[in-house]
UniProtKB/Swiss-Prot annotation:
Gene that encodes it: Frmd4b
Residue ranges that the Swiss-Prot or TrEMBL entry lists as coiled coil: 414-451, 535-559
Role of this protein: Member of GRP1 signaling complexes that are acutely recruited to plasma membrane ruffles in response to insulin receptor signaling. May function as a scaffolding protein that regulates epithelial cell polarity by connecting ARF6 activation with the PAR3 complex. Plays a redundant role with FRMD4A in epithelial polarization.
Keyword Coiled coil: yes
Stated name of the protein: FERM domain-containing protein 4B
Keyword Ubl conjugation part of the UniProt annotation: yes
Native species: Mus musculus
Biased composition (Low complexity): 571-590, 941-958
Length: 1035
């Protein structure tokens, strides 16, 4: 029993194990078969694609041409889009390739254009199996085909317009569609023959867009309307039909516009149209009439970042009256949204269209005139081949155009007949050119022979340049003397009276010498020494002429003849002025635009620096001499000759226009040695450059540190502002210290006078000032000044030098260009910026991180505010900014108090200050308590920016021009290093304001700075800059 049981168990185990084994084997076989089949499919697919991927790299592409031909080629990784365009253009013998481009449809269904400076395979080509489809089309449109030079270009424009109308890219009404279809029939098939043939041709030609067929479901109706127009244009040549077709299409509003589907901030869909005219925003159902149109001249910057495309629009109507004077504030940002790839495509298209717009503006001046449409029609009619009616398809797919290293070879895509005809045409053109060149050459050879013969007659030798044919001998020429010259009859000796004749000839010769000397003496732009010498030569020549005339008269009297009336030249007073006069080289100009630079003035060390005049707002209309008081005039009348030196002054001081109704004291006269901008001539252009002579210290100004509470000014003896001392224009200050050149300016009073530093006084002050300011001595430009706020530690090397190094009206740095040099700034694939019109000066986009802290927007609206980021993508803060109303109010109180204090000091006598030699200020800067300087040190928010401007009158400085307005941060570029201590952080703005070019900064003395601090400390309003704070944030 037990054995039987064990045998059954063994049989069961054996059968079970066998079953499991068979199941495993069958499963493995099934799995192996399936996997083997999959491997076979993979191998079969790989072997099937080996024809396409013959090389390990490359992509099979198919270019659809405008004449319905297809060009197949293998694009290598190194092939540029420009080379591919050249290859395609060679199949049309196209010369004007700048209007065309190659486009493709990406995976999202959006049309993209190949960028010519990129490689073809670097673009986001569709990843679908099979060859990549590319389309050759017109990318840049023009106003009329009359501006096209080549007939092949005109024909391609016609084919492109016909394709765009058929695809619906150009919206056309039904009646216009029927007219265009009739013109296409006339162009391709010729004159009307029968309705049956016309209907048959209309079914094969692409003339009806889908929209027209939807409006008119009856195809017979459309064909009948086309036939009606077809009968009217019977007899029209092919060229005339093409020209009429293009005239109709060019008049359509949607012609030449590239449309993109975008959304605004509210999520509403729009069409964004970009063309050579600008950027337009269209309704989704209406592509004809734009809701908004921004021309290129209105735009300033184009930005894109990820899914946002933004443009900065310059709208003068948005500039308020109060802001028109102070800066560029008529900017608002228009933004649209779409997917990232589409946004980048829009940005690239906008850049290319703007570049084409600029190129068109420049090329219009070069093109003499547009071609006549009749001539274009004749050229198109004479063309034997009708490429629009030919459909050529390459069936042999094994033939490719290999273009990897720039070698572009085409095969099998050009008609032999067309090539032969083009060759014949080119040969004829070359023969015509050869004939014209030969005719011109013969004409020039004859002219050269004549010139050589005339030279041989004068010199007696035949020149080597005389053209000779092979075997030809040069002609024999005799030298002819006197044949081309005519002597004066008076110079020829006569037998009547040789002595008198000699005197007469000497008189004529001397008269010619006098005329020559007069011309030399009256030449402009001469230095004083040369001019004086020439004047003396002219005077001597005139005296010699007068002596000869007297000798002639005496001799005639002795001979019993009447004295002759010779026209002796008398030196006029304008050419030979009195050298003893102190005003010999001065000139009075009635027109403020006249030149301020005279002959005796030394040129500036900067050869290309523009010269500037004082602005018109100053009221300077006449340049003449002015005395500060009646006593000074009286003293000048009595003792002018004792006080004046032998030199004459080439400069004059400027007169300020009197402002009626003011109780302010008279503005002092600008001294001649103040090297201010009044000696310069204005330049209407917007070019700015650094105006300095020698080193950076050559025109700096001395700031004295005083411990007293009141400022003191040194008074000098009375002296005329038109004295005859040699003036220093700053052109030779290259090795002396900056403290050697200054002018003492007393406070304004009835006894106010000015002093000009002469050579002797300059030598005395040079020894005195070495002990006062040692950091400025020498001519090294990199000497740093110590900042009292940093306990004697030198400031950063990047800090700009004081404003004394520059002439007013020029930016502190030449490299701080206010706008880009054209082109676009492209960062990466997700963001970019392009400057459209660099002429607009916006304070927000002059640079990147370097300039971002100094940019502030004047606008309060979120749409109008220009963001600080150069890509215009920073979100505006939703929370309200820190209020600075109380701060601004306290600052204004301090400024008004300072203004009143300065007025009182000018109006009152300066007896206490007049005798104190402790402090002296530069007359160019003066003691102007500049209200704008205080505003310069205060960080202004956008809300308080406009209120920081303060209207003041002229100050007591003789070198100060401003009489109307002093402005804060936007007007004063760079504060002078002042010795006072303040709670304001030092802010430096390297960008000059575009609206005011003649503003200057003025240092505050220690007293004024401390008083301003006290006023602010009383209200417990202190502003500090946090190191980690963002621009425009008050901490």
């Amino acid at each position: 029993m037990a054995s039987v049981f064990m045998c059954g168990v063994e049989d069961l185990l054996f059968s079970g194990s066998r079953f499991v084994w068979n199941l495993t084997v069958s499963t493995l076989r099934r799995w192996y078969t399936e996997r083997l089949r999959a491997c076979h499919q993979v191998l079969r697919t790989w072997c099937g694609l080996r024809d396409v991927y013959q090389m390990t790299e490359g992509r099979h592409c198919q270019v659809h041409l405008l004449d319905d031909r297809r060009l197949e080629l293998l694009v290598q990784p190194k092939l540029l889009s420009r080379e591919l365009l050249d290859l395609v253009a060679s199949h049309f013998n196209l010369k004007e390739k700048e209007y065309f481009g190659i486009t493709f449809i990406d995976d999202t269904g959006q049309e993209n254009w190949l960028q010519l400076d990129h490689r073809v395979l670097e673009h986001d080509l569709p990843k679908k199996p099979g060859p990549t489809l590319l389309h050759f089309a017109v990318r840049f449109y023009i106003e009329s085909i009359s501006f096209l030079k080549d007939k092949n270009t005109v024909e391609l424009f016609f084919l492109n317009a016909k394709a765009c109308v058929h695809k619906g890219q150009i919206e056309v009404d039904s009646e216009t569609i029927f007219k265009l279809a009739a013109l296409v029939l006339q162009e391709s098939k010729g004159d009307y023959t029968s309705d049956e043939n016309a209907r048959k041709d209309l079914k094969t030609l692409p003339v009806f867009p889908t929209k027209t067929l939807q409006e008119h479901p009856s195809l017979a109706y459309c064909e009948d309307r086309v036939i009606e127009h077809y009968l009217k244009i019977k007899g029209l040549t092919r060229g005339q039909a093409v020209v009429q077709y293009m005239k109709i299409v060019e008049a359509l509003p949607t012609y030449g516009v590239h449309y993109y589907a975008v959304k605004d901030k509210q999520g509403l869909p729009w069409w964004l149209g970009i063309s050579y005219k600008g950027i337009g925003q269209y309704d989704l159902q209406d592509k004809v009439k734009p809701r908004k149109l921004f021309q290129w001249k209105q735009l300033e910057n184009l930005y894109f970042r990820e899914k946002k495309f933004a443009v900065e629009v310059h709208d003068p109507r948005r500039i308020s009256v109060s802001r028109r004077t102070f800066g560029q504030s008529g900017l608002f940002v228009q933004t649209w949204y779409a997917n990232s790839s589409l946004i980048k495509s829009i940005w690239v298209m906008a850049i290319s269209q703007h570049q084409f717009y600029l190129d068109r503006k420049q090329s219009k001046a070069k093109i003499p005139s547009a071609r006549s449409l009749d001539d274009i029609a004749m050229d198109l009619t004479e063309t034997g081949t009708q490429r629009g009616s030919k459909l050529v398809t390459l069936e042999a797919k094994s033939q490719f155009i290999m273009a990897s290293n720039g070698s572009l070879i085409s095969s099998g895509s050009q008609d032999s007949e067309g090539m032969e005809e083009q060759k014949r045409e080119k040969i004829l053109e070359l023969k015509k050119k050869e004939k014209l060149l030969q005719e011109k050459l013969l004409q020039k050879v004859e002219e050269l022979k004549k010139i050589c013969l005339r030279e041989a007659e004068l010199t007696g030798r035949m020149p080597k340049e005389y053209p000779l044919n092979i075997g030809e001998k040069p002609p024999q020429v005799r030298r002819r003397v006197g044949t081309t010259f005519k002597l004066d009859d008076n110079l020829l000796p006569t037998e009547e009276d040789p002595a008198l004749q000699e005197l007469e000839s000497n008189f004529l010769i001397q008269q010619k010498l006098v005329e020559a000397a007069k011309k030399l003496a009256s030449e402009p732009d001469l230095c004083k020494t040369v001019k004086k010498k020439r004047k003396q030569d002219y005077t001597d020549a005139v005296k010699r002429l007068q002596e000869i005339e007297n000798s002639i008269n005496e001799y005639r009297i002795r001979c019993g003849k009447k004295p002759s009336q010779k026209a002796a030249v008398v030196p006029p007073e304008d050419i030979i002025p009195s050298e003893s006069s102190s005003l010999s080289d001065t000139t009075t100009y009635d027109d403020p635009n006249d030149s301020f630079t005279l002959a005796g003035q030394r040129p500036s060390s900067v050869p290309h620096s523009p010269r500037i005049l004082p602005p018109k707002s100053l009221g300077i209309e006449r340049i003449h001499f002015r005395k500060s008081s009646i006593n000074e005039q009286f003293m000048d009348t009595r003792h002018s000759r004792e006080m004046l030196s032998t030199h004459s002054s080439p400069y004059k001081t400027l007169e300020r226009r009197p402002q009626g109704g003011r109780s302010m004291p008279t503005t002092p006269v600008l001294t001649r040695n103040a090297y201010s901008s009044s000696h310069l001539e204005p330049d209407s252009s917007s070019q700015h450059c650094r105006q300095r002579s020698g080193s950076l210290e050559s025109q700096s100004h001395l700031l004295s540190e005083m411990d007293s509470d009141k400022p003191f000014f040194t008074l000098s003896k009375s002296q005329r502002s038109s004295s005859t001392e040699i003036l220093d224009d700053g052109s030779s200050y290259t090795s002396q210290s900056s403290s050697e050149y200054y002018c003492v300016t007393p406070a304004a009073s009835p006894y106010y006078t000015t002093q000009t530093l002469d050579t002797r006084a300059r030598g005395r002050r040079r020894s005195k000032k070495h002990s006062v300011s040692t950091s400025n001595s020498g001519s090294m430009p990199n000497l740093a000044q110590k900042d009292p706020l940093r306990n004697g530690v030198y400031s950063k090397g990047q800090d700009p030098p004081p404003s004394g190094y520059y002439i007013a009206g020029y930016p502190p740095y030449a490299e701080c260009d206010l706008y880009y040099s054209g082109g676009y700034v492209y960062e990466n694939d997700t963001e970019g910026q392009y400057s459209v019109n660099p002429s607009y000066r916006s304070s927000a986009h002059y640079g990147y991180d370097r300039q971002r802290d100094y940019s502030r927007s004047f606008h309060e609206d979120e749409v109008d505010r220009v963001p600080h980021n150069p890509y215009a993508t920073l979100r505006l803060p939703r929370k309200a900014a820190v209020k600075s109303e109380h701060i601004t109010k306290n600052i204004h109180k301090a400024l008004v108090a300072e203004h009143l204090r300065g007025w009182y000091q000018r109006a009152s006598g300066q007896k206490d200050q007049g005798h104190s030699p402790q402090t002296s200020f530069d007359s160019d800067r003066g003691s102007q308590r500049c209200l704008g300087f205080a505003g310069l040190q205060v960080p202004c928010s956008p809300s308080s920016r406009a209120s920081s401007y303060s209207s003041v009158s002229s100050t007591n400085a003789s070198g100060n021009w401003r009489t109307q307005l002093t402005i804060g941060l936007s007007e004063y570029e760079n504060p002078v290093h002042s010795p006072y201590t303040s709670y304001y952080g030092s802010i430096y703005n390297p960008l000059s304001s575009p609206s005011r070019q003649y503003a200057e900064t003025t240092p505050l003395d220690g007293t004024d700075g401390s008083q301003l601090e006290d006023n602010l400390e009383g209200s417990e309003q202190r502003l500090f800059w946090h190191e980690d704070s963002k621009p425009g944030t008050l901490v």
